[in-house]
Amino acid sequence: IKVHVKNNRWANGSFPNTPEGEAVFTITQQRFDDAVCDFPDVSSKLTSFIDWDTDNFESSMRDAEVLLTWDLPMENLAEVAPNLKWIHCIGAGVEHMLPMNWIPQGVTITNNKGVHAEKAGEFGLMSVLMLHSNIPAVATNQRLKVYDSLYASPIAGKTLVVLGTGSLGGAVAKKVQALGAANGQSQGHVKHGIKT
């Protein structure tokens, strides 16, 4: 099974849009090998082709069955990639690929829904703690060389309302809950493991 990995070089207005983002989101041969080593029954059947942008896209996709990518040339994909069975988008969202009328018949497309939950939980926890502790006002006062006492009690015992407790909001709720804050949620169904 040939897997074509299409990485993107960073560019303004694109993804990734910084050199740091390119380093985070690039799937190197080592990263690919590390990811598949936990699945020896499958990994022995895989060959990978690591590519950049569309440098070798058409020639490599002639015999690729799997495409691992953020974006791709959608025009004439059935002709360019006649053996393609599966496209996996490395992001959680696929809105940039809409409308999906370009997907050849018989090709499955999947995404990384939930992959950003851990980082979103950390970012959300940081944001909640900063707001609770008046850090934006403290930073503004410091910049203005003003000293005002701004106090905050511990967050334990406070209530946080999370609007949307999918994978991202749920991760924030769990992180804040671990500090003793209660969570309210605004979703139509209860997510297991989140106390309301």
For every predicted segment, state its role:
Residues 1-66:
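N-terminal glycine-/charge-rich "phosphate-binding" loop or analogous flexible N-terminal tail
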Residues 5-7, 69, 91, 164, ...:
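Short beta-strand/turn micro-motifs composed of small residues
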Residues 32, 53-54, 71-75, 92-95, ...:
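Short, polar loop motifs at secondary-structure junctions
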Residues 45-53, 66-71, 140-148, 192-196:
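Short gly/ser/thr-rich secondary-structure transition/capping motifs
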Residues 45-47, 108, 182:
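Conserved beta-strand segments of alpha/beta enzyme cores
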Residues 63-139, 153:
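Phosphate/diphosphate ligand-binding glycine-rich loop within oxidoreductases
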Residues 115-119, 146, 159, 167:
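Residue-level detector of alpha-helix initiation sites
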Residues 150-196:
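Rossmann-like dinucleotide/phosphate-binding beta-alpha-beta segment
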